[in-house]
């Protein structure tokens, strides 16, 4: 599929749909396996490839956010254990960048989940985490809906 070797019996439109759907699902499955194998770096790569193949699946954005959140938590612990100074300041900067990444992935997950009824329950759960992080980072929820709307498919934008 990655090599784009279309079977001779398949027309271009069918192949494009097949490739998009199945390549994304394959990478998503491999990402889940990597997560279960406690290999978040490999999982991240797989979920990024799944998003590249099909950018509308909220599950991939959720997992990317979950992985980024794990990285953020490690940085926060290091920050809390560090002494005042440049290293601590650098850790705070890194943590802020990481939480922004988590917020971005979760906003994408919520936006995509709202576009597909089968993912509405998942979207509501992710939204709760998103709101917590967004409020912590921005001191309010002002601007959150605009961020989510930015990632909604064109047909769902208000």
Model-derived features with residue positions:
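Canonical positions in the second alpha-helix
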Residues: 49-50, 109
